[in-house]
Amino acid sequence: MNLKNTWYAGFVLVLLQACTSSDAYLEQGRALLKEGKTREAIAALNQAVEADEENAEALNTRGVAYFEQKEYSNAQLDYDQAIQVAPNFYRPYYNRALLKIAQSDLEGALKDYSDAIRLVPDTARSASSDLYLNRGQLFATQSQVQPAITDFTKAIELNPKNALALYNRGNLYFNQKNLPAALADFQKSVEADPAFGKAFYGLGLAQLLNNQRDAACLSLKQAKQLGYADAVNAVAQYCQ
């Protein structure tokens, strides 16, 4: 009995050491990835996976590193494996959706975004906002305007400072000739991100259509100053 207990305690100790070692390599890999040292990150993450084959975080992060290297088949394998060992972990679905977009598999990406949205914790509001933003952009590229607006609206509810969601919804409203709604979204977008030249450009065009020439020229000149190329011609045409 004592021998069995000793063996069990030793097994638990080895298991804990393996998990600790895997997590240490994972953190090392993440740090290297943030520094742009992708190859070194993959080497560290290889060790994390060798120490614990079911470390879904390590598999997902290595998938991201492979994706950055454009090694799409390896990224796919890691995301698939992460989902297999942790099917309720939203991040591999999120990242696999990005991979599928790069591979022009839009239907597959849409499904993965939807799964990630279903699984993302309520506490992860920023990540959830980005998921709705990305799925909304996918709907928009497929000319599914109302689903796109619905997703952008949800993204904004989760993060009122999501400048890209505000811009995208404003752009759809602009195309629908809903000028008041477009103006409001473009204005909030530039307030959320004062360096967002494209949003200043959209705001300027909406202001022009709303007979606010002085305000429009200020917005267009700001877009030009921020380096948004289309603003150059707009300033020359409307603000001289």
Annotated model-derived regions:
Residues 2-7, 17-240:
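Alpha-helical tetratricopeptide repeat
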Residues 11-13:
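Hydrophobic helical h-region of N-terminal Sec-dependent signal peptides
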